[in-house]
Structures are given as structure tokens and as C-alpha cells.
Amino acid sequence: MGTTQPIRNRQELQDFSSYYKQVKPHLRNYTLVVLGLNTALRISDLLNLRWKSVYDFKKNCFRDHLLIWEHKTGKRNYIAINQNAKNALYLYFMEKNPDPEEYVFSKRTNPYKPLSRSQAYRIIKEDASHTTSEEAISCHSLRKTFGYYAWQEGVQPALLMNVFNHSSFHITKRYLGIEQDEKDLVYLNINL
């Protein structure tokens, strides 16, 4: 198995993000995929989100930002919740009617216990096996896909480095698989 890859093909990304909504309906899994793709959070941070982190129960509305302490780095991160993420959260919230202390991505049998990383991996792998041609897809692909498309949309390198907490843009390019894409273009465009 190779290095985890982002989902580069836009149609495959569309199919991947909607699999648990349209093909095999399961709102928890759908929300996991959509939130992962739209926040660039590591799976450990996604799985530790509680409903009170994304929904203000006093004001009865979704929050505009997530404030988390990253599990891996211990750093504080303040992340805007975009409309796609809010829409997925809304659908799941309406189905679940959760308590503020429940985990957003909880076990089916106990909403006060987070989904395991291995179960999250199985959810992502099942989705990818039906929707993408890329074999090296894992939970980390959600984060890499966010970065890959941010790069494609022209997000400044320094900002991407900041989002991923990398010390150099070279590391960020390698992390997102951009370095290989650029190298491939050189070979594909030189036809002697």
C-alpha cells in the first residue's frame, strides 16, 4: 500500500462526498465525510467533537467556528464551519436530536462514546471502494483532499502551511501530492 492520497478527480470527489447520502444512506457517516473534507481536521480531532462544539444549544443554531485543541500537536485551532459542513450537520442533528455532551460521531450503541478510529477507517474505505479509482484512500485523505483543492483554487502557500502546521512549503507540497503532480506534468508535456 502506498502513501495516503487526496481524491484528485472532481467527479470521484462528488461521488465520494455523497455516497452515504444518496447511495447508502447513513447520516452519521455522510457527516463524517463532509466535515472531514471541509475542515481539514485529523480523524482523531473529528472523532472527539461533541455536539456542543458545533451547535449552540442556548441560541439554537450552529456555530460559525470550531475551537479545538489539536490532539496531535496540542495547538489551539479556530476553524470556520462552511455551509456544506453546516448542511450535513443540520441533517444529522435533525435525525439524532442529540444531547450537548454526546459525541457527534458516536458509537451506535452509546452516544457518549466516540466512534473508533478503526471504524472511521472502515467507513472511509467502503465509500472509496465504491466511488474512487484511487486505492490509497484513508481517513487522512479527507485532510489531504481539502489541502489539494485549496491549492488548486489558488490559496497562498504560506496559508496552507499554516493550516497544516508545516514548517516549509516543500513539506506541504509533498504532503498534498502536488510535488509529484507537477513532476508528472513535465514528463507528460515534453513529447520529443
Give residue ranges: language-model regions:
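Short, basic (Lys/Arg/His-rich) helix/loop patches that form interaction surfaces
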Residues: 20-23, 122-158, 162
